[in-house]
Amino acid sequence: MSSTDWILLVIVIVLFAVSIFLAMAETAFVRMNRIRALALADEGSRRAEHLLRMLEHPEQTLNALLLLVLVTQLTSATLLGVILEGTAGALGVVIGIVLQIVLFFVVGEVAPKTYAVQHTEAAALRSTPLLWFLTNFAPLRLLSRGLIGVANVVLPGKGLKEGPFITEEEILTMADV
């Protein structure tokens, strides 16, 4: 492997670690309810105050979060494919695909989401600073809104004038999956 391959491998590992944290954050966020966040905020938790504000408009946080999850996973998979194709050819790509599927499913999705289900409050509060940043980071927010606008052009319709765009029950069902 060349020095470039090693650098790419480090990037893949970092992206995978970020993806794991984002999976935990996503599940914790969708499972957290306003009542519990309000109780934690009343106890003086600054993170709970931020979480409560984000729960008032969950679509803003979820749009940015899901976009970032997609970017980290696709970039990681692509870079690993490039590395393995360069070192082992077509067989390396196949190995990379299988490796990514197993790692992303078990380590990158199931484990962090299970943790978030079992420790919802702790995971939600732990991930709040990152979610708050993502929700308020203008370039990511604008990109997310722009891509949603493109989707609305591709799939036109009246749209919804008022939320909730997704019910709390639907979010909890998605988190359980």
Spans of model-derived segments:
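Membrane-embedded alpha-helical segments of inner-membrane proteins
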Residues: 1-177
